[in-house]
Amino acid sequence: MGASSGRIGKSMLTQGTFPLASSGCLKCDSTAQSLHASSSALIEFLVDFGIKPKEFPHKYVTGLSSDDSPMDLNVGMLNSSLRDSGYSPSNSKAFSIITSLFLFSTEYLGLICTY
């Protein structure tokens, strides 16, 4: 719990492809685990079908996080996790789609986790 209750803080746990942290809220953490599994499955699906990052143009998603947002996302860790999985943020449409999905879902979690 502590000062960061209800928020994804800066000290995150890396699980599979996406960084994930405990928010101190059981409902939120359960939802986050489901979203994490879905996002990881999406990456595996793309890889299984031979979709390579270089085949797609990339459009950067801006305004991903701020200190006063409901969820304090560490986008750098997300980017690193995706790069480690073979998706480069400079040339991957898949990166953009997955990042957008993850950010949208965590903003949703921010709404239901506000104390």
From Swiss-Prot:
Miscellaneous comment text of the record: Partially overlaps BNA5.
Listed name of the protein: Putative uncharacterized protein YLR232W
Organism encoding this protein: Saccharomyces cerevisiae (strain ATCC 204508 / S288c)
